[in-house]
């Protein structure tokens, strides 16, 4: 595997309903086996369910959930002198939203509701109100970074 070539960032088109690239990326993360229509149906139905059940703007709820779950710090493993250190590093915006969507989807799929639409709707609403499993995952990540603050001088090469 060559280390010289950096993969080019793909241009992702915004979704049809809300004209949002962030929501389009979220739909792509939900998608399994190339079934984008199914993924879109799940996400849009979950947003409609949020609007009906809680009478709030579903797109604003989605944005709040993603913003609340997005981490600012994470730990990366750095090898120095035969020892591996967990070094806290800043998370750039694109990776932060990627982690947030992954955590929300994983938390939703582990919920007890029967359909993924209900699971996703409840997890998004809870995340927008700073509750839920995805928020807990973000807090755990920040705690890990805080606990390893002493190793921050071993910053990885990409930070220099």
UniProtKB/Swiss-Prot annotation:
CDD domains given in the database record? uS7_Bacteria (cd14869)
The UniProt keyword set, sorted, is: Ribonucleoprotein, Ribosomal protein, RNA-binding, rRNA-binding, tRNA-binding
Query: Which terms in the GO cellular component ontology are assigned?
Result: small ribosomal subunit
Q: Known InterPro entries for this protein?
A: Ribosomal_uS7, Ribosomal_uS7_bac/org-type, Ribosomal_uS7_CS, Ribosomal_uS7_dom, Ribosomal_uS7_dom_sf
Alphabetically, which GO biological process terms does the record hold? translation
Q: Does the keyword RNA-binding apply?
A: yes
Q: Listed GO molecular functions?
A: rRNA binding; structural constituent of ribosome; tRNA binding
Q: What does this protein do?
A: One of the primary rRNA binding proteins, it binds directly to 16S rRNA where it nucleates assembly of the head domain of the 30S subunit. Is located at the subunit interface close to the decoding center, probably blocks exit of the E-site tRNA.
Report quaternary structure and partners. Answer: Part of the 30S ribosomal subunit. Contacts proteins S9 and S11.
Q: Which family does it belong to?
A: Belongs to the universal ribosomal protein uS7 family.
Q: What is this protein called?
A: Small ribosomal subunit protein uS7
